[in-house]
């Protein structure tokens, strides 16, 4: 199964990385790679995340990081919708 990042999710990752890089550039690169590796594992185990707060979605908690990947599982792909901080206000749809 293919993992595809939406533009919103890719923007979320870039914003997270840019924010961390302001103080710790090396850490920002490592965290971005950790997030990408964790999300890419959904290709083999697309239902490993919990039921999402928004109907039809699933959520992969990126432990030990404070981020959650929100995604949908389709017939032949996992679509990453957003990458949100656990304390962030969630969209309703």
Regions found by a protein language model. Give the residues of each.
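Conserved strand-loop elements at the edges of beta-sheets that form or border functional pockets
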Residues: 62-64
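Enriched for short, Lys/Arg-rich terminal
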Residues: 68, 72-93
